Amino acid sequence: MEKENLQAFLAENAIKPASIAYAASKRFRGEDGQPIEWKISPISNDENKAIADRNRKKSFVPGTRETQINFDQEQYANDIICACVVYPNLNSAELQSSYGAVGAGELVRLMLTPGEYQDLFQAVMQANNFDVGMDEKIKVAKN
């Protein structure tokens, strides 16, 4: 049996996740008339956990002493989009002022149609490797 080699698993040898370019809307066009691509960068597990934790709220069950945890999926989606989109700069005061938005979260919702927003969320999930199903991972491991 071949000795296990852990070199590929060392941090310095791991391939860093790449940013992706994604045209979130056909309505934003460059000088060449082509849709402008947004730049989406993946986040770390720690950043994702912090975003998820911000969107968990503990509340009391009425009439009992029990608590339940509620997860705000819509706000999580908005927060992860804002964390991953690096271009355009959603924190730009000029851009927010143009749309009358206060904050990156409100800005991205105002900039995009509901369908574009949902597609952008899917692109953000893909950039963070949430799109690979378990069946596909098992097939890769078997081969």
Name what the model sees in each region:
Residues 32-143:
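Short, surface-exposed, charged amphipathic helix/loop patches that serve as local interaction elements
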Residues 1-16, 137-143:
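Low-complexity intrinsically disordered segments
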Residues 11-29:
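Short acidic, Pro/Gly- and aromatic-enriched capping/linker segments at domain boundaries
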